[in-house]
């Protein structure tokens, strides 16, 4: 099945699979490319992966400079407000034996995610992108943060996945 198959979310899920194949190969692990969810989860565990960090930075520029105190971004207004105001949500691996005091588990689903009691716009995470380097982003809810955790979780061993996003011109 293809879930939210655009560039983001979507394509990052495919990048995680390719990165895992590269890591396993570079480590000299003996494996065949997995064809099942359980196979992908086992390969992730065999490679010792405990976390996947998805970082994004909006670097698009307009032809004319942005006026002071004007917010410009590639997110739709509705999407930005929705993601910023809803509780911060992230994949939470089964290897984690605790959750933060201000976090809760979901009543339904696979158990591969938690949510925080504050909105994503109030939750900062240290992040990194290749061009700008280190950055302080926002922990925003994104489909792939949970779908990747769910897809790659071995129920005894898992991983944490979150998306740290820094909108343009927010510093």
Can you describe what each PLM-predicted range is?
Residues 5-14:
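Domain-scale recognition of functional cores that engage charged ligands
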Residues 2-3, 54:
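General beta-strand structural signal in soluble alpha/beta enzymes
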Residues 1, 15, 19-23:
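Rossmann-fold NAD(P)-binding glycine/threonine-rich loop
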